[in-house]
Amino acid sequence: LRGITPAMKAQAPREPPQTEAAPPQPGTDETAQIEAGGLQGDMGWGPGWSVLTQATFIEQFHYAFPSAYEGQNSFGSEAEAEHTFSFSLFLGRRLWEGGELFFDPEFFQGYGLSRTLGIAGFPNGEAVKAGFANLHYNTSRLFIREAFGFGGGKETLEADPRQFAGEEDVDRLVLSVGKFSANDFFDDNDYSHDPRTQFMNWALWESAAWDYPADIVGFSDGAVAEWNTRSSTWHYGIFMEPTESNGAREDYHLGKAHGQILQFDRRYIVGGRSGTTRWFAYWNQAHMGSYAVAAQQQDPEDIILTRSYRSKVGLGSSWNQELTESIGAFLRASWDDGRTESFTFTEVDRSVAGGLSIAGKSWRRPADTAGIAAVVNGLSANQRHYLEEGGTGLILGDGALSYSPEEILEAYYEFRPWHGLEFGPDFQYVRNPGYNSVRGPVSVYAVRAHVEF
C-alpha cells in the first residue's frame, strides 16, 4: 500500500440531500450504522456547533493490457499504480433559528491512474482531474442554509456535513447559498452516491451524462431551493460555470454562463420496504466547443478553436429500493444532447447503470457492506466522430477510435470493525476503455480505507 496515507478526491463526493435524513443501510441497526452519505455526530464544541471530519485513502493498480495504439489522453496500457488521499473538516454553526453556516476546508493529494484520463467511467471517484503531488488545500464548501417551516408535523434530522441534528417541519422550504458541490443536493441515491464508502466508479456514484457545473476539483458557487413534504421533494439549483473546460476560474458572464437543474423525488413504501424515485432535467450554458463545427474546420481535432457561448440539455433518473432486510437495489439512467463538448464532469452522453448493496447480516457482520454493479456508457454521433478523427476531449483521446460502448463491472467489500472505520477491496473490469474496441479489457484493483468521526 506504499504505507497507508488515505485518498483524494474527484468531483466532489456526495452527501445525502440536506432536506431529508438518509434511510438506514439495509440490515444494519441504527446504532451500528455508518451513514453512507457522510459523517454523523457532533464533536461537542458546545451548543450551536457541529464538528465532523473524514479521511479517505485509495490505492489502485492495474496490470498491462492489450492495446492496438495509444494517444494523448489514453488510459496507459502498461502496468501502473497510483493513490489518492483526502482529508475534510466539516464545521457548522447555528446562526439563528432555522439559519446555519457551514465551512468545509479540505486537503487532497495523489493522482488517478494515467493522470485521470482514458476511461469515461473512471474507476476512482476520489481522483481530481488535475492531481496533486503534495497536499493541496481547497475551501470546498462555504454556505448558509436557511429553513422555513410550514407545518405538516415534525421530522427528526440527523447531523451530517450539510445540516444540524434536530427537528424541523415536514413541510419546509430550505434555501442554501454559497459554495458547494451541485451533487451535494442533486442526483442522490441511497446505495451509490459516495465513492468514499460505496461504489467508486464515476458512472455509478453519479449520473454520468449530467455534466454538472464545477471547477477542477468539483465545486461551484450557487444557490439551491428545496421544497420538502412527507413523500416528495422538489429541488431547483443554479450554479456558476468555469471559464473553460475543466477550468479553475468561474465565468462571471452570468447571463450566458451558468447551469440550472430541476429535480423531483418521490418516496414510497411497498410491502413494508422503502424506495425512492428521482427525475431531473438540466440546462447548461457555457463557453463550449461544438463537435459539428469542429468537424467542418481545417483542424477537426481541436475543439477549443470552436468555443463560443452555447447550451447543453440533459435528462436523468434514478431509483433505489430496499428489497429485503439486507439487500437494496439501485438503477440510474441519464442522457444529454451530445452537441457540445463535455465540459466539467466526464465524456458520456448516454448511460445506464444498476446494482445491489448487500449488508453483512446474513454472514454475521451486520455493519459490513458488499456491492456489485454494472454500467454501460455511450457517446453521441457527433462526439464519436470527433474522437474518430483524432480529437481530444475532457479526458478522452486515443488518436483514433474503433467505437464500442464502454462496459464496466464493479464489486467492493467494506469491513466496518467499529463505528467510524471502514476498509476493504474493490475490483473493476472495464471493457472498451474510452469506447475503443481495440484497447483492453483492463482489470483495476483497489484497496480503500475510510475514517470518520
Regions found by a protein language model. Give the residues of each.
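Residue-level signature of outer-membrane beta-barrel architecture
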Residues: 93-95, 105, 146-148, 179, ...
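N-terminal periplasmic/intermembrane-space "pro-region" immediately following the signal or transit peptide
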Residues: 1-80, 90, 94-96, 100, ...
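Hydrophobic, lipid-facing positions within transmembrane beta-strands of outer-membrane proteins
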Residues: 49, 83-89, 138-144, 173, ...
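Transmembrane beta-barrel strands of outer-membrane/channel proteins
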Residues: 55-61, 103-107, 175-179, 236-240, ...
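Outer membrane beta-barrel transmembrane domains
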Residues: 265, 280-309, 337, 341-430
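Outer-membrane beta-barrel "beta-signal"
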Residues: 140-153, 372, 441-453
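Short loop/turn motifs that connect adjacent beta-strands in outer-membrane beta-barrel proteins
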Residues: 39-51, 63-64, 92-101, 149-172, ...
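Surface-exposed coil loops of outer-membrane beta-barrel proteins
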Residues: 117-140, 151-263, 301, 390-401
